[in-house]
């Protein structure tokens, strides 16, 4: 679905922007995470962290991935127990390594990227702005992609949804 969106098909794949690599590394992170959830093997958790580290080096939005996974673990019945194992913590520590070059660059450049990003936000939540953002995404993704994506997220709320479907839905909700 995602690659059908004009931006990802044309803009993210042709122009020199960090979105293409970001999305590739996030997709690899999600694949590794699904394997880690199934196997609970250290190598799968480490792979999740490695791909997340590359994503974190691409763009700040990659930080929504671990936040979404943490929300899933805390808010889904019984999943919090995974936090008692070393796997998620290994993934998180390796993932944070991807921020190291970003932080070092910001230290050397008076936190320029943070000043840029924080200077573009307003002081409070505005429902009209949120609605405008959702409409913009719907147009940006082409109506068919937006509708199919919305249906896929809705399907993830069903009782018979698989762990993989629910987990991917939680990861997708973060950026939305």
Regions found by a protein language model. Give the residues of each.
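Membrane-interface alpha helices of multi-pass inner-membrane proteins
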Residues: 44-59, 94-96
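Membrane-interfacial loop-to-transmembrane alpha-helix junctions, especially the N-terminal start
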Residues: 44, 159-172
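Short acidic/glycine- and proline-prone juxtamembrane loop motifs at membrane-interface regions
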Residues: 11-22
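Membrane-interface transmembrane helices that cradle and orient dolichyl/undecaprenyl
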Residues: 29-45, 151-157
